[in-house]
Amino acid sequence: MPQIFPMNWFLMSLMIMMILIFMTINFYFFSMKMPNKNMFNLNKKTKYNFKW
């Protein structure tokens, strides 16, 4: 048990760090791409508006 619990804590913290880095990369990427709005409004006849 003492050898398994720090490894689970390490993997859990590493996955949390990976998710946070991925969320920040997506946030900066879409905040840079938002003034164009050509990626999102290709068809203006669609019902659904994809807003980030």
UniProtKB/Swiss-Prot annotation:
- UniProt keyword annotations, A-Z: ATP synthesis, CF(0), Hydrogen ion transport, Ion transport, Membrane, Mitochondrion, Transmembrane, Transmembrane helix, Transport
Q: Where are the transmembrane segments?
A: 10-30
Which ranges of the sequence are coiled-coil?
Answer: none
Family, as annotated: Belongs to the ATPase protein 8 family.
Q: In terms of one coarse class, where is the protein primarily found?
A: mitochondrion
Subcellular locations according to the entry: Mitochondrion membrane
Q: Which GO terms describe its biological process?
A: ATP biosynthetic process; proton transmembrane transport
State the organism of origin: Rhipicephalus sanguineus
The record lists its disulfide bonds as none
Subunit description: F-type ATPases have 2 components, CF(1) - the catalytic core - and CF(0) - the membrane proton channel.
Described function = Mitochondrial membrane ATP synthase (F(1)F(0) ATP synthase or Complex V) produces ATP from ADP in the presence of a proton gradient across the membrane which is generated by electron transport complexes of the respiratory chain. F-type ATPases consist of two structural domains, F(1) - containing the extramembraneous catalytic core and F(0) - containing the membrane proton channel, linked together by a central stalk and a peripheral stalk. During catalysis, ATP synthesis in the catalytic domain of F(1) is coupled via a rotary mechanism of the central stalk subunits to proton translocation.
* A cellular component term, taken from the record's GO annotations: mitochondrial membrane
What topology does the record note for this protein and the membrane? Answer: Single-pass membrane protein
Q: What is this protein called?
A: ATP synthase protein 8
Report the superkingdom from the record: Eukaryota
